[in-house]
Amino acid sequence: MLGVTVSFYKATVSFLVLINSIIENIGLFCYHQESLFWEIKMSTPLENYLSSCGNKPSAAMCAYVANLQQVASVNPKIAASVVNEIQNQRSHLKLIASENYCSLAVQSAMGNLLTDKYAEGYPEHRYYGGCVNVDAVEMEAAREAEALFGADYAYVQPHSGADTNLVAYWAILSAKVETPTLEELGVKSLNDLSDAQFAELRKRFGNQKLMGLDYSCGGHLTHGYKMNVSARMFESHPYGVDKETGLLDYDAIEKQAMEVKPLILLTGYSAYPRKINFKRFREIADKCGAVLMVDMAHFAGLVAGKVFTGDYDPVKWADVVTTTTHKTLRGPRGAMILCKKEFADYVNKGCPMVLGGPLPHVMAAKAIAFKEANTPAYQEYAQKVVANAQALAKALQDLGVRLQTDGTDNHLMLADVTSYGLTGKQAEAAMFECGVTVNANALPYDKNGAWWTSGLRLGTPALTTLGMGEAEMKEVASIIDQVLKGTKPGLTKEGKPAKGKIDLDPAVKEAASKRVQALLSKFVLYPELDLEFLKKEFVK
């Protein structure tokens, strides 16, 4: 019995010694990172990237991984969605005229603690203390914008195109209605007005007239469309395009302006494929006594890139110019106002007049984008955007597609898809199924209305950013034609052709999708980023 007990004791001791040895060895492996299993399980994504790239890490990839690592530590689903969006954008040809790809430097400028600072007011005139660095950022962005566009003054606070148009409208109303009224009443401030006097001023604000391009002819919602606040602020008198040519008729616009006598003559577009003669608009504005305002949100990049110069440069001729900072300008999602000195003080009151304050981190990104745009490389890019648009337009026309105004001078075109027996919405849906993003767009005086539409709006800014050229535009046109020819209207429950449903030939879908992916494989979005690594680390 004693022998058995001793043997059991020795076995137990040996087992404990073995366990202790294993524990010590695991500790050594952990300490020296010699265990691949432990390293994979416990290392961070950034450490994994650095160990995988040898002695040549990419600064862009390091920054991106570090950023996503921070995000994933709080909410992995958001990090996964960001990576999935990269995958999505790498998998689709982006032909939406209002979209582009901003640089990784622009993106990085937005991701910092500047977002934490309130900065109501304008530089060196803030309602909050501690804004010295936000002032520096805003003034730098404004200087870059003024240098880029040759503007008297730049106001870089607005968050969107709609916001910036509202600020511009109220700045003009303040300059041309409010200030004369205060002078007439012999007071210096709105706060000095009696209730009755303020009511009279409000009435004068509401009686002003706006003349902008009709929404159905390529104008924007904020240019006096009835469903938008602009038509409720002003008495809206939209002008159109010639029904035969689809072009602006300057003589007809002048005649209308002389009859209407608007406070604001507004030009600019979201779906007009030709350049605008702003010198001619200046002449019309002077003749009818209007303030000339231009919304160049869509083509600001073509102005910055010196494609539109002389009579076609809005900054040279307009009193007030508004623009977004994304689209052709390739900046962050935001906006700004460029104006003559006469309107600078009024524009500066955008906060608190319309805005609650700026987004400092976005203003920082705007400064980066403006700096990027003020280079020979960007001017070359802007020229290529138009060359690609014209190449795509010609290729589509060679395939029998009718284009509004018979071509384009800028970054976009309007294609009539009714010859394929489709509405714009059906064409949009079919293209997306094959990996091409476009948007349905009404043609002037469209019988299908503003929702179903008869057209597609196609733009080349994003494809040009990827590096595509005129040869690729021919392939894109061929893909569009192939998909639309292979699509028929779907049927309603009653068996009648529907305006929204489609019947896409599966063989066409497969063939077109392969062509799209073949094209995208040669022109990769953000090639600095290793998508497979990001998916492995952040998409679970």
Question: In which residue ranges do the predicted regions lie?
Answer:
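Conserved PLP-enzyme active-site core in the AAT-like
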Residues: 140-400
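Conserved PLP-binding catalytic core of the aspartate aminotransferase-like
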Residues: 402-470, 533, 537
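Cofactor-/ligand-binding subdomain signature composed of acidic, glycine-rich
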Residues: 48-88, 109-115, 124-128
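Short, Lys/Arg-enriched N-terminal segments with co-localized hydrophobic residues
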Residues: 16-41
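A glycine-/small-polar-enriched, mobile loop at the entrance of the PLP active site in fold-type I
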Residues: 90-101, 112-139, 269
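PLP-dependent enzyme catalytic core of the Aspartate aminotransferase-like
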Residues: 43-64, 68, 76, 450-540
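Short acidic (Asp/Glu) and glycine-rich catalytic loops that position anionic groups and cofactors
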Residues: 85-91, 116-123, 262, 343-348, ...
